[in-house]
């Protein structure tokens, strides 16, 4: 009987490692989105203007954690600014979507450290989105570029 219990516990641990449960609620303390508690719904169809919960793209996750922008295991609350098929450009300090300026990038953070600066123009692929925060100091797609659908956990609705 104990062996069956251990086997079940082991299977549960393996399943958890393979299928990470997504957060159901997120408490946002960042000024880049309205403060408060958000409920997370399944991914579903994502549209421009939606608020989503997303992981910092893997390339920037550890970097952002080291700078103490956001802990590596804490998701972001961001607005979907551009969707698949949109043209996104980052030229100098200006970020444009479909030829319209939508965000300004800072060259350095509040401590004087250089910020990342992806640059150029791209048309977002079928599983790419540009996520932006509402505040000018938001750490978001203006610095790390498009976010893949796999990093979007779900839509967020503020309670």
Predicted regions and their residues:
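Structural motif
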Residues: 37, 50-52, 86-87, 94, 128, 134, ...
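Acidic/glycine-rich C-terminal interaction modules and beta/coil loop segments
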Residues: 105-156
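Short, surface-exposed secondary-structure boundary micro-motifs
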Residues: 43, 57, 93, 100, ...
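Protein maturation boundaries and topogenic segments
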Residues: 1-75, 123, 144-159
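Solvent-exposed loop/turn segments at secondary-structure junctions
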Residues: 44, 88, 95, 137-138
């Amino acid at each position: 009987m104990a062996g069956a219990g251990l086997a079940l516990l082991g299977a549960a641990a393996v399943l958890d490692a393979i299928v990470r449960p997504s957060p159901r609620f997120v408490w946002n303390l960042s000024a880049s989105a309205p403060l408060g508690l958000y409920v997370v719904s399944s991914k579903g169809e994502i549209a421009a203007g939606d608020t989503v919960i997303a992981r910092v793209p893997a390339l920037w996750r550890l970097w952002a954690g080291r700078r103490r922008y956001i802990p590596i295991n804490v998701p972001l609350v961001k607005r979907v600014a551009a969707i698949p098929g949109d043209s996104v450009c980052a030229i100098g300090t200006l970020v444009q979507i479909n030829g319209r300026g939508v965000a300004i990038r800072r060259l350095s953070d509040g401590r004087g450290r250089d910020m990342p600066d992806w640059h150029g123009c791209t048309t977002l692929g079928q599983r790419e989105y540009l996520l932006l925060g509402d505040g000018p100091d938001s750490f978001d797609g203006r610095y790390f570029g498009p976010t893949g659908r796999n990093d979007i956990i779900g839509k967020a609705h503020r309670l």
